C-alpha cells in the first residue's frame, strides 16, 4: 500500500485487463521516480529470494492456496483478461516462473509496442 501511494498508482493488479487508454492514463499518473525505486527494491528482494532457492524449490509448483492469496490481495482481478494468469501460474514450477519474464514475457509485448509506435507515427503525420 505504501508503494502504491508513493507511485500514485490507481491499481494493484498486473494490469492485464487494462485497455490501451487505461494504460496511457496509468502511465500519465505514475510518479516515474518512485516507480524506478519500486522496481529496484523488487529486484533486490527477488535476488535475495532466488539466491536462497534450492534445486527442490525450483521444481515446486505454486499451490492453490498461494494462487487464491494472489487474487485475495488484488494481484489479479476477477476479469477474464486477468484471471487466466492464475491458471497459467498454477501450471508452472518455480523455475518456469523465473524464466518467463526474461524470455517469453518481453516477446508478448512487442506487438503492442509496434502497434503503438505506428499509431504515434500516424498521428504525428497528421499534425
Residue ranges and their predicted role:
Residues 1-18, 44-51, 64-127:
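Short, contiguous alpha-helical
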Residues 22:
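A conserved mid-domain beta-alpha-beta active-site/ligand-binding segment of alpha/beta enzyme cores
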Residues 39-42:
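Alpha-helical segment that forms one wall of the substrate-binding/catalytic cleft
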Residues 57-65:
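Domain-scale activation on soluble regions of proteins
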Amino acid at each position: 500500500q505504501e508503494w502504491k501511494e508513493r507511485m500514485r498508482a490507481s491499481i494493484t493488479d498486473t494490469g492485464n485487463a487494462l485497455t490501451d487508454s487505461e494504460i496511457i492514463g496509468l502511465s500519465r499518473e505514475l510518479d516515474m521516480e518512485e516507480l524506478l525505486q519500486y522496481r529496484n527494491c523488487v529486484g533486490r528482494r527477488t535476488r535475495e529470494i532466488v539466491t536462497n532457492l534450492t534445486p527442490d524449490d525450483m521444481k515446486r509448483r505454486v499451490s492453490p492456496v498461494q494462487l487464491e492469496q494472489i487474487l485475495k490481495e488484488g494481484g489479479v482481478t476477477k476479469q477474464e483478461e486477468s484471471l487466466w494468469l492464475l491458471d497459467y501460474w498454477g501450471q508452472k514450477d518455480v523455475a518456469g516462473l523465473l524464466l518467463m519474464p526474461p524470455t517469453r514475457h518481453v516477446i508478448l509485448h512487442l506487438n503492442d509496442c509496434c502497434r503503438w509506435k505506428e499509431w504515434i507515427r500516424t498521428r504525428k503525420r497528421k499534425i
